A protein has these predicted regions:
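Transmembrane helical elements of multi-pass membrane transporters/channels
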Residues: 12-32, 167, 192-209, 222-292, ...
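Signature of the first transmembrane helix
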Residues: 6-74, 103-109, 137, 171-172, ...
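Helix-loop junctions and terminal segments of transmembrane helices
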Residues: 62-78, 153, 212-213, 272-311, ...
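N-terminal membrane topogenesis motif
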Residues: 1-29, 82-93, 125-127, 208-209, ...
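Membrane-proximal transmembrane or re-entrant/amphipathic helices at the cytosolic face
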Residues: 1-2, 427-430, 452-511
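Membrane-interface helix-loop junctions in multi-pass transport and translocation proteins
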Residues: 36-38, 42-43, 158, 169-201, ...
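Interhelical loop/hinge segments that connect adjacent transmembrane helices in multipass membrane
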Residues: 1-10, 186-187, 203-247, 289-304, ...
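Hydrophobic transmembrane helix module of multi-pass membrane transport proteins
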Residues: 95-248, 352, 381, 454
Length: 511
């Protein structure tokens, strides 16, 4: 019964997140098209660079949110309202201090804007305006939005989607209209970010009327919950590794190229981020369920669910990456024009990187559920390898060199180390089980690609005259691959069939 409830909540969260995902995805691509048409690639590249600079300052967040989330699972399971209030109060106290660090750091950073954006052909105030709006939006998460962590940890993330995402959709629509019809859309952007934050804060208060944060007790609570402070310190190093992976690349690319190349890279990254967001919408709602499962302590059930989730996520990852490689260039041509297409090697490097990033999520979800953040050398090593190789290889091969540096660091730390750490420290299983599981799934994925192209030999091919017809043919190939892969995953007895039976059992129980 508990398992069915956990699964039911996960499905509800996923369905709501998916609905908002598809609406938001359309608006994102349309708004980017409006940006390019009315503001140009230079301003778009500026916005990407300003975002990355702010993300650097957000390293000060130290991973407090993740530390709080894994600490909340047990009191939420036991309905311990006193502990919940104290933990969220400690989070608010820590976030207030982080907010002031971000403010001071931003002021110092803005003093160097004349040198950072020396090559920019736009007026310097554009950089200050872009960064300022992004800064205010970020500060709202420290002063107002931090309480949403309770909704996520309690598997009620759909309430965040209802209120916050709806406000974000309205914000994006107004931003598009402002850019098209007004001289400056930044004011609209800022106003709706504030409104969305206030709506979310009200939703949390209505859902948890007992939730009363007392920030004045912060220092006292930090002594009462030393495990949280310890996890925060450990997570700081993991944040560094994550930042080096996701946020330094555009800055290094800009150092070796131009804002226009950053914009081209940003177009492709928008497609990839769309895929990552889709996977997040489908699977992240299950993370709180994993935390709840770990809190119960049933080792056999924990391992069984791991195998199911690994299989399902691997299936989706293969489909997504196949589609990205097949369809992205054609989509970019249809979306913004042929001049924004990058070479095949760049796309291949981005696709392989995406494959590793998406496949890591099952291991990461379990690491977060266990609060297993003690391997602080791993993110430091990852960040060092990433930055050093990106700078070195970027010097010789430009954009592709930077991407290769990212890929190598991911392979060594995320692909090789993280599964070993989880299986040894938490699951208490031999790594051999994971390796066999991975090899089986990867072999099926490769065989499915071979079968797909074998079938295509019997399908008449034409020299397509338009990008649209080529795109439609690419969609057909992707669907064919999906059907073959899905059939093989199900009938070969991988974890997918157990997951499907679990869903069927839950649905039958509702009838």
């Amino acid at each position: 019964m508990v398992t069915d409830s956990r699964t039911s909540k996960s499905i509800k969260n996923s369905l709501v997140a998916l609905a908002f995902y598809f609406i938001n995805l359309v608006l994102q691509f349309f708004s980017r098209k409006v940006f390019l048409d009315y503001l140009g690639a230079e301003i778009l590249g500026l916005n990407t660079t300003a975002t990355n600079l702010l993300q650097f300052l957000n390293l000060a967040e130290l991973g407090i949110g993740s530390a709080i989330a894994c600490t909340l699972y047990k009191p939420l399971l036991e309905k311990d309202t006193v502990a919940i209030n104290e933990i969220v109060s400690l989070q608010g106290w820590l976030y207030r201090r982080i907010a002031w660090i971000v403010i001071v750091g931003s002021l110092v950073l803005m003093a160097f804007f004349p040198w950072i954006f020396a090559k920019m052909p736009l007026p310097l105030w554009y950089a200050y305006a872009s960064f300022g709006v992004l800064l205010v939006s970020a500060l709202l998460s420290y002063f107002v939005n931090y309480k949403q962590i309770v909704l996520s940890a309690d598997q009620k993330e759909y309430k965040i989607q209802y209120s916050y995402k709806a406000s974000m959709l309205i914000k994006t629509l107004c931003q598009i209209l402002a850019i098209r019809y007004l001289r400056d859309g930044y004011v609209w952007w800022l106003v709706f970010a504030i409104v969305a934050s206030l709506v979310l804060n009200r939703m949390v208060r209505q859902t948890y009327p007992f939730l009363e944060t007392k920030l004045g007790r912060g220092r006292e609570l930090s002594r009462k919950y030393p495990a949280i402070i310890k996890k925060v310190k450990q997570l700081f190093f993991h944040k560094i590794g994550s930042f080096a992976l996701t946020q330094t690349s555009p800055i290094i690319i800009y150092a070796y190229t131009t804002l226009t190349v950053v914009a081209l890279y940003g177009n492709y990254m928008l497609v990839i981020l769309g895929i990552q967001t889709l996977m997040t919408a489908i699977f992240n709602s299950m993370n709180a369920g994993i935390g709840n499962l770990v809190a119960e302590g049933n080792r056999k059930q924990i391992m069984s669910v791991f195998e199911e989730l690994f299989s399902v996520r691997f299936l989706f990852t293969c489909i997504m990456c196949f589609g990205v490689f097949m369809l992205t260039p054609l989509f970019v041509i249809l979306w913004v024009g042929n001049e924004y297409v990058m070479d095949t090697m760049t796309l291949l490097l981005m696709t392989v990187t995406l494959f590793i990033q998406l496949n890591r999520t099952t291991v990461d979800a379990y690491i977060n559920a266990y609060g297993l953040f003690g391997d602080i050398f791993a993110p430091v090593t990852e960040a060092s390898i990433n930055i050093c190789l990106s700078v070195l290889l970027g010097y010789f091969w430009g954009l592709n060199g930077v991407l290769l540096g990212v890929l190598i660091s991911l392979f060594l730390v995320v692909f090789c180390w993280k599964p070993y750490y989880l299986f040894r420290k938490a699951l208490k299983q031999r790594l051999k089980l994971y390796i066999i599981m991975y090899v089986k799934h990867l072999s099926v994925a490769i065989v499915s690609i071979i079968l797909t192209y074998s079938v295509l030999k019997f399908v008449p091919m034409h020299s397509f005259e338009s990008a649209l017809s080529s795109f439609v043919y690419g969609v057909f190939i992707t669907i064919l691959y999906t059907l073959i892969l899905l059939s093989m995953f199900y009938f070969l007895g991988l974890g997918l069939n157990r997951f499907i039976r679990r869903i069927q059992s839950m649905m039958n129980g509702r009838k």
